[in-house]
């Protein structure tokens, strides 16, 4: 969180709320105040989770007295903070304690005027005890295609799987990943996630920190000693989190992305991991692998102001984010 704030905190204000019971911390609300300008259309002062919109999962930290903590946080924001007009808490796992309690409050506490919406679907793979068991769970067609494409790739090239530890540094491995990710999106005439220098610098910083903690897991499929596909993942408590991928479009006929995914699953099973979380958004390349999916919730509240109500309506109606960006939305630095 501190890493994200270092790169994206400019123009925002922290609203970290702490609940104590007899002096002991029982809950933390990692929030911030962001002020957005929509050119001549209006301005919006929004309470949101630190890390939004980049974080795939957000949550309150609730150690004890969960209901009392949440009510304390919301009451404080409503009664004691007058500098915001819109609350948007994104990407809360539906099956988390925060998600359960917020759903109950949305249903029962009408005076709060909280509203929940289903924000995104998050696919994941339940990992079995053996690679053979996992392969049996795939469709016959997918198993056949994986075998055929790997055989063809090995026939045409010298193939090797590597991790970031095979590079001279974490930075070198990450820059190779950035290039593959961007190359894929440029082939579709789109920008890609790492077109922003700010976003690249953040992930370089985060990868260094995660590497030191033993959480970083960055995979590469090498073809004739050149990177053809890459996957940027994290490991934590017997779970793998798959953040982003990239591949060289020249190797698209070989399905190098799927071949690397198969290698990652095999590595997870051999290491005894229990789940491979494919994270936010159910895209086709994830759906082919997922054994199930979870939902992320979003909780909203309009506090005041006509523009806040208009913004709430527009975003609920499913107006594309790209269209909203055309209004010239920017983060106020004042």
Spans of features found by a protein language model:
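Residues at the C-termini of beta-strands that transition into short coil/loop
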Residues: 64, 127, 165, 300-303
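A short acidic, often aromatic-flanked loop/helix-cap motif at beta-alpha or helix-coil junctions
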Residues: 68, 167-171, 306-307
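Membrane-proximal basic amphipathic "stem/tether" segments
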Residues: 301-334
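A general structural signal for short secondary-structure boundary/capping elements
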Residues: 225, 267, 278, 321-329
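Acyl-donor binding region in acyl/amide transferases
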Residues: 13-14, 34-118, 234-295, 300-301
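Short intrinsically disordered coil segments
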Residues: 77, 136-144, 313-318
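A short, structure-level motif marking secondary-structure boundaries and short turns
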Residues: 134-135, 191-192, 248-251, 266-268, ...
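A conserved beta-strand-loop-helix scaffold within acyl/acetyltransferase catalytic domains
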Residues: 1-48, 90-253
């Amino acid at each position: 969180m501190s890493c994200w704030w270092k790169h994206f905190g400019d123009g925002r204000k922290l609203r970290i709320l702490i609940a104590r019971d007899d002096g002991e911390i029982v809950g933390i609300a990692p929030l911030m105040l962001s002020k957005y300008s929509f050119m001549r259309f209006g301005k919006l002062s929004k309470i949101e989770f630190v890390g939004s919109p980049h974080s795939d999962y957000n949550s309150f930290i609730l150690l004890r007295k969960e209901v009392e903590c949440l009510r304390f946080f919301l009451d404080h924001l409503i009664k004691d903070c007058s500098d915001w007009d819109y609350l948007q808490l994104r990407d809360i796992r539906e099956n988390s304690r925060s998600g359960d309690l917020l759903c109950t409050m949305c249903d029962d506490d009408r005076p709060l005027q909280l509203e929940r919406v289903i924000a995104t679907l998050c696919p994941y793979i339940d990992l079995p005890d053996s690679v053979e068991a996992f392969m049996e769970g795939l469709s016959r067609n997918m198993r056949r295609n994986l075998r055929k494409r790997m055989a063809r790739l090995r026939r045409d090239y010298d193939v090797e799987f590597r991790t970031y530890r095979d590079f001279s540094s974490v930075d070198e491995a990450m820059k190779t990943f950035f290039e593959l990710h961007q190359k894929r999106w440029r082939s579709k005439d789109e920008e890609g996630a790492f077109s922003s220098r700010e976003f690249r610098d953040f992930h370089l910083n985060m990868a260094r920190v995660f590497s030191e903690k033993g959480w970083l897991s960055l995979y590469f499929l090498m073809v004739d000693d050149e990177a053809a596909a890459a996957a940027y993942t994290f490991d934590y408590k017997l779970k793998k989190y798959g953040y982003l991928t990239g591949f060289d479009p020249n190797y698209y006929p070989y399905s190098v992305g799927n071949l690397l995914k198969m290698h990652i699953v095999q590595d997870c099973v051999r290491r005894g991991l229990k789940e491979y979380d494919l994270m936010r958004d159910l895209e086709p390349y994830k759906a082919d692998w997922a054994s199930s999916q979870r939902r992320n919730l979003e909780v909203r509240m309009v506090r005041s102001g006509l523009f806040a109500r208009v913004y709430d309506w527009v975003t609920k109606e499913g107006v594309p984010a790209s269209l909203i960006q055309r209004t010239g939305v920017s983060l106020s630095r004042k």
